[in-house]
Swiss-Prot record:
Coiled coil: none annotated. GO terms for biological process: chaperone cofactor-dependent protein refolding; DNA replication; protein refolding; response to heat. This is Chaperone protein DnaJ. Homodimer. It comes from Rickettsia akari (strain Hartford). Participates actively in the response to hyperosmotic and heat shock by preventing the aggregation of stress-denatured proteins and by disaggregating proteins, also in an autonomous, DnaK-independent fashion. Unfolded proteins bind initially to DnaJ; upon interaction with the DnaJ-bound protein, DnaK hydrolyzes its bound ATP, resulting in the formation of a stable complex. GrpE releases ADP from DnaK; ATP binding to DnaK triggers the release of the substrate protein, thus completing the reaction cycle. Its cofactor is Zn(2+). It is found in: Cytoplasm. Zn(2+) 1 binds at residues 147, 150, 200, 203. PANTHER family: DNAJ HOMOLOG 1, MITOCHONDRIAL-RELATED. CXXCXGXG motif repeats lie at residues 147-154, 164-171, 186-193, 200-207.
Length: 371
């Protein structure tokens, strides 16, 4: 093959990067030693990789175009860039392109040492009245916060962070084993892709420290049991200036002595006298906001009936709509009656029996069974 890199790849000197890559992949697959029996395949494969290694780099390509092939090669040799070392670097690149082409993967890009902080979860218990009105709660927890000495950079004041020269900022190195490559964390930068020559003494180069925090969180009115509220950026600080995680506050509402919650509706047991149940009337009932309202009891109300107070339940979160309060009637029978009350009830009993005897209903049907 000709030593002209453009001719090796079969492209013109004005070829775009996309055209270069397309030509490179086609030839690399054709001449890869593991995919062909051609005796000259390995030599051709090395030439293809050397050509692409230069032309894919805009600075190297510009130098190659300016000085020509021979001068460029001599300069590379004096700079210590042997062809054997370049070949191993390039073969790792080709495997990345193979996987990208066939499996949807991609060549690993330089990593950033600015890793995002972890999300945090906080369990907060409130009562039903607090859930109704909404409340501002102060919470305390420990987490990683930005180092106040290096301001999150991880390096001593005035020091700069440099790209790792062992992995080129990728954070990993590759070892070839046959057709496959094994990727492992770079031993020099520990997978960070960057080198801190003089780490901050307080945070040991991490850019963050452990600290107890106090935070005021707003709980909106109408929050339900099990609601998760997200506080963006209030989680753990990121590594070396990375974005902070989020804080998730999980709400638990303690059971109430009077009300049972069903979404935005409230249910409660309402005891009334049998007189009120029979005659009807109005009674005062307490509602969740801490006052009393009138409830009309229809005459003839039965035990277990449900009476609804519209818009007297819980508010719906971030809405002006409220649920209802549903009362479950429980008729109370007096245990201790005065003589006068007993006499009146006896009269009521006689009249009730007389009415049932005359209406030919259930009472007469039962009576006929014994006659």
């Amino acid at each position: 093959m000709s030593q002209d890199y453009y001719k090796i790849l079969g492209v013109s000197k004005t070829a775009s990067q996309a055209d270069l890559k397309k030509a490179y992949l086609k030839l690399a697959k054709q001449y890869h030693p593991d995919t062909t029996d051609d005796k000259d395949a390995e030599k051709k494969f090395k030439e293809i990789n050397r050509a692409y290694d230069v032309l894919k780099d805009e600075q190297k390509r510009a130098a190659y175009d300016r000085f020509g092939h021979d001068t460029f090669q001599n300069q590379q040799s004096r700079g210590g860039g042997g062809s054997h070392a370049g070949f191993h670097h390039d073969i790792n690149d080709i495997f990345g392109d193979f996987f990208s082409d066939f499996m949807g993967g991609g060549r690993r890009k330089p990593t950033s040492s600015k890793a995002r902080g972890s999300d945090l979860k906080y369990d907060l218990t409130i009562n039903l009245e607090e859930a109704f009105h909404g409340i501002e709660k102060n919470i305390s927890f420990s987490s990683e916060v930005k180092c106040d000495t290096c301001h999150g950079s991880g390096s001593e004041k005035g020091e700069t962070v440099t790209t790792c020269d062992a992995c080129g900022g990728v954070g990993a190195t590759r070892i070839q084993q046959g057709f496959f490559t094994i990727e492992q964390a770079c031993h020099k930068c520990k997978g960070n892709g960057q080198i801190i020559k003089n780490p901050c003494k307080k945070c040991h180069g991490m850019g963050r420290c452990h600290k107890q925090r106090n935070l005021s969180v707003n709980i909106p009115a109408g929050v339900e049991n099990g609601t998760r509220i997200r506080h963006t950026g209030e989680g753990e600080a990121g590594i070396r200036g990375g974005n902070s995680g989020d804080l998730y506050v999980d709400i638990a509402i303690t059971p109430h002595d009077i009300y049972k919650v069903d979404g935005a509706n409230l249910h409660c047991k309402l005891p009334i006298s049998f007189v009120n149940a029979a005659l009807g009337g109005e009674i005062e009932v307490p509602v969740i906001e801490g006052r009393k309202v009138n409830l009309t009891i229809p005459a003839g109300t039965q035990n277990g009936d449900q009476l609804r107070l519209r818009s007297k339940g819980m508010p719906k979160m971030r809405s002006t709509i409220r649920g209802d309060m549903i009362t479950h009637i429980h008729i109370e029978v007096p245990k201790n009656l005065s003589k006068r009350q007993c006499e009146l009830l006896e009269e009521f009993k006689k009249e009730s029996i007389s009415e049932k005897e005359n209406d030919g209903s259930f009472f007469n049907k039962m009576k006929s069974l014994w006659s």
